[in-house]
């Protein structure tokens, strides 16, 4: 998936994008700046997004780590356009690698939807009151033992952040035959 395709899929704007980056193949997407590797796209999540997307609690504004993610090799950073001003001093040298959106969590989810559609493989969705992680693990094990290349959620990443991060692994590993996805249900099924 080219960076230009990512920008289009998330409804982002990159007015100063370095055109050499537009054709860059992007395969890995992260929300933790400490995990950035060369070529990754870093999604900088902020407190308003967490609240707007139903996450309770106090979360760190990862926009403060956007410049360090770029210094660590990230190809680009996706951030809320209204967060730039607060971090303008650190981000100004990097404007050619910034992608602006209204909501970085929603953008991450839109990108996962686009990757899923491009992949087109089979999905086993696991959602129950208790035992999702165990059921996911057993199902993935049986499918893998039958010779199918199987993707499964990392740990118990089953919410509005973890689920998209798992699906986005298909951008780098499209050879999977099936994805076993554990999903915590906080919204009606038609909104997932």
Where are these regions (language model features)?
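Phosphate-binding loop of NTP-binding sites
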Residues: 107-192
């Amino acid at each position: 998936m080219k960076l230009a395709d990512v920008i289009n899929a998330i409804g982002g704007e990159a007015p100063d994008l370095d055109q050499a980056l537009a054709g860059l193949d992007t395969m890995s997407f992260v929300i933790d700046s400490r995990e950035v590797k060369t070529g990754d796209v870093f999604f900088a999540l902020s407190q308003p997004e967490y609240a707007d997307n139903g996450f309770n609690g106090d979360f760190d504004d990862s926009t403060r780590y956007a410049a360090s993610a770029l210094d660590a090799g990230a190809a680009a950073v996706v951030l809320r356009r209204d967060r730039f001003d607060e971090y303008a001093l650190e981000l100004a040298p990097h404007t050619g690698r910034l992608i602006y959106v209204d909501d970085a969590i929603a953008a991450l989810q839109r990108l996962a939807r686009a990757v899923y559609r491009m992949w087109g493989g089979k999905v086993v969705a696991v959602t129950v009151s208790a035992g999702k992680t165990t059921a996911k693990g057993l199902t993935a094990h049986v499918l893998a033992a039958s010779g199918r290349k199987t993707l499964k959620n990392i740990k118990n990443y089953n919410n509005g952040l973890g689920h998209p991060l798992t699906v986005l692994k298909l951008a780098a590993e499209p050879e999977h035959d099936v994805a076993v996805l554990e999903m915590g249900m906080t919204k009606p099924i038609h909104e997932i």
